[in-house]
Amino acid sequence: MSHRGWAAAALVISMAPALAAGSDVLTQARSAAGGAAWERTPALAAQGRITASGLSGTWSRADDLQRGRWAVRQDLGVFRSANGDDGQRRWRQDASGGVHALNGAYSLRAAITEAWLTRRGWLRADAASASLSPIAQRSDEGHDFDVLRATPRGGEPVELWFDARSHLLARSVRELPISLQTVRYADYRRVGGLQLPFRIETRDSSSSDVETVQVDGWRIERHAGAPAYAAPTPPDDTLLQAETTVPLEIDGMVVVQARVNGRAFDFILDTGGHNILTPDAARSLGLQPVGAGASGGAGEGSLSEQYVRVEQLQIGDASMRDQHFYVLPLQYGTVERGERVPLAGILGLEIFERFFVRLDYPAKTMTLRKLGHTEARIAGTPVPIRFDDDMPLLDGRIDGVPGVIALDTGNSGTTVVQGVWARRHGLAERLKQGIETVSYGAGGASPNWASRLQSLEIGGHVIERPLARYAEDRAGAFSSRTEAANIGTDILANFVLHIDYRAGVIGFERRPGLSAPPFNRAGLRAYKESAESFRVAVVTPDSPAARAGVSRDDRIIAVDGVPAARLSGRQLFDKLIQPVGSELHVTLKRGAEERQATLRLAEMLP
C-alpha cells in the first residue's frame, strides 16, 4: 500500500493546442459544482469505506473550506493510518501509529497545493490566486476532458481534468518526488446545494495498488474545529527505563539483533525503511500476514506486500508492544549471508520515531533512549533534518553545489547522486563518464556509473574525493526530482550520529582515521542469485575480469576454491577489493560448461 497521503497512477498524454482561457472552464465548473453554495459552506466531513492492498475498512475525511486544513483517517484492521494538515504543520501517522511532520522543501510546497485543493480553489474567484495554463482537450476511456494546470502561489502544480459534459472535476494529477499520482472523482451527488463525489479512486505510478473509497455520506459542518485536523497522539507502546546499548554488525550493511515475540533475529537498520519481516521470518513465528499490496525501493521494480502485527519487539532493554510489520519478499541478495542464517528483515522509521538513537559507527554500537524520558544530548555538529516521506533529509553540498541529501543507513555502499539534480546543475555529463556498474535494492537492479566526487559536505564536515554512483533510474528511490544524493555507510562510517526525529536534528560527531574501502579491483559486479552461485551482472571493458574472459551472465560457483554456497555477497565484495596484484581464482559456469579463470586485481578507480 502506498505510504502517501494521496495516491494514484497517472495517465500521461501529450497536450493538445490550447482551446480556451482557464477561467472560462472554471466558471463552468463553479456553476456545475454548486456555485454560490460553496461560499456559504465553512467545512465538510465525510465517512465511508475504503479498499486498498487487499484490505477493507473505514475511512473519514474532514475539510476546512476556509483555511485549507484537512485530515484523512483510515482503519484497515491490521493497522490504522492518517494524514493531514492542522494549519501549522503537515503531518503523517504511519501504520505503526508513529507521527512525524512532512516539512521538507517539496512538502511545504505540496502542502500549499493540498490546502488549495481542500478549499476547492478552482471554484473560487480568480482561482484563489493560482496561475493557470491554457486549456487543452484530452480523451480517455471514451470520455472527453478539459484539462488545465493550476499552480497555487508558492505551491506545486496540479493538473485538473474536468468532464467536458458535466464540467465537474473528474481527476487531479500531481507529480511527487519519485512518481505521478492521480485521484479520480466519480458518482457526484447533490448535498446541501453542493455536488460532491461519492467514489474516490486513487493510484500511484510507483505501485500497482488501487485505493478505492466509497463515501457513505458527506455532511456540511458549520464550525471547523481544530481537533478534526489535529494529528493523533502517538501510542504509548514503548518501555525503557533509562537507556540501552547494543552491538552492531557493520560490514556495509548496519545489522542489529532484535527479539520478535521472544525470538532473536538479525535485522538491517534502515533510516529509509520501515519495520519489515521476510515471509520466512513471519512463518517461523507462526504469523499469518494479511492483505495484498505492493512496495518498492531502490531500483525500478516492486515487491508484493502484506501486513502483520507482533506482540513484542525488543532491542536490548527497550521493548515495544503490539507492533505493525510489513511482510516483504526482500531480494535474495539483500538478506543472504552465505553459511549464516539469513537476515529476518528491516527495522526502520518506527524505531527512530520512538527513540533518541546514537549510532556509533567506529565503535559499532547503538544506544537507545526513550524520547521525552530524559534530555538527550546532541553531540557534534547539529544538522536540521526534514521529511518529504519517511527518510531524513538534510542540506549538504556535492562538489560545492548545494542540494538535499537523504541519510540512509540502509545504503550499504557509496553515495548515490540523483540524475535529475545532476542534470539540473551540469554535473551529469561528467558523472556518466564513470565506470559502468549496477546496484540492487528492494526494487531490483539500478544501473550506475561510478566515479569520485571532488567533495561532499554535511554540516560543515567535508569528505574529500569520496566514491559515488550516478543513477538515472526512471522509477524508484533513485529517480527523485527533489533530492541531490543518498548517503550510506561509506560516508556515515566517519561519524557518530546522534539522531532525534522529534527535535528534527542529527548530530554529526566526526571520528578521524577511517580508510574507506577501495573501488572494485576486479572489474566485475556479481550478485547472489541463489545459494549455489553468483551471477555476473557487469564486466568492465579492459578490466581484470574482461582479460580473464569473464562475461555477463556467467555464474560464479566458487572463489579461491570455496564454493559459492559458503560465501555471502559481502564476502565476495571483500575478495574483489584485495590489494592490487592479488590473484583471484574463480570457477565459472556458462550454460553447462564449467571453467577456471584467474583475475589479477588492478586499480580501477584511484
Regions found by a protein language model. Name each.
Residues 1-9:
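Bacterial N-terminal signal peptides that target proteins for export
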Residues 8-17:
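Bacterial N-terminal signal peptides
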Residues 21-28, 91-158, 164-166, 175-176, ...:
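Flexible, processing/modification-adjacent segments and terminal tails
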Residues 24-98, 133:
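N-terminal mature ectodomain segment of secretory-pathway/periplasmic proteins
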Residues 53, 153, 161, 186-606:
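Pepsin/retropepsin-fold aspartyl endopeptidases
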Residues 57-61, 79-83, 156-160, 179-187, ...:
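A structural detector for short beta-strand units
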Residues 60-69, 83-88, 158-171, 214-227:
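A short, surface-exposed beta-strand/turn
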Residues 72, 148-150, 171-172, 198-202:
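Beta-strand-dense domains in secreted/periplasmic systems and polymorphic toxin scaffolds
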